[in-house]
A protein has these predicted regions:
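Domain-level signal for soluble alpha/beta catalytic cores
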Residues: 1-180
């Protein structure tokens, strides 16, 4: 939902909307997504426990669909809204239709620690797709080239059990090829 608002709330999980309004927002999009022949739904860049709960309720009502869940954890420790990963795992981890849990839209340097934390609270397969490493400056609305000039080593991610690895903001096909 936060990316839809384009107000930065996708980075904080602080939505100026009621739970009912959030349910209404996602219900229509969920119905449209489920009408198609999709095998797996990607529920990604989720910054808020309330949004995760809303989406899990929709998933529970659609037993023929499966999904992976990817979290927004910009501080490298918790969900963007401050919710612990243990709490998120308790909400997500016991659902048969959740195929994997992980993180996306974050600096590559934060991925390993978050995957270790998630692995400590769930046995679900792990996923990670990090940004390029550049930093978004919300004041100027520009990317700052702060990324190290070296490829990301995903070997430690794989060792923790990460099975899906990709790229998010500002990554290129060449970046993805280097991850393979």
């Amino acid at each position: 939902y936060g990316a839809f608002t384009a107000d930065g709330s996708e980075y904080t999980g602080q939505f100026d909307i009621s739970r009912t309004e959030l349910e209404d927002y996602h219900s229509l999009r969920w119905e449209l997504a489920c009408e198609g022949p999709s095998d797996v739904l990607a529920l990604e860049t989720l910054p808020s426990l309330i949004e995760i709960e809303v989406l899990m309720n929709l998933l529970d009502r659609t037993p023929d669909k499966e999904a992976w869940v990817s979290l927004s954890c910009p501080n490298g420790k918790t969900l963007a809204d401050g919710t612990s990963l243990e709490t998120v795992a308790a909400v997500v981890g016991d659902r048969r239709s959740v195929l994997a849990l992980g993180v996306n839209c974050l600096a590559p340097a934060l991925v390993e620690g978050l995957l270790r934390s998630i692995r400590g609270v769930t046995d679900l397969p792990l996923i990670a797709y990090a940004n390029s490493g550049e930093v978004w400056d919300s004041g100027t609305r520009n990317w700052l080239d702060t990324a190290p000039a070296r490829p990301v080593d995903t070997g430690s991610w794989r060792a923790i059990g990460c099975q899906i690895i990709g790229g998010c903001c500002r990554t290129t096909p060449d970046d993805i090829e280097k991850l393979a």
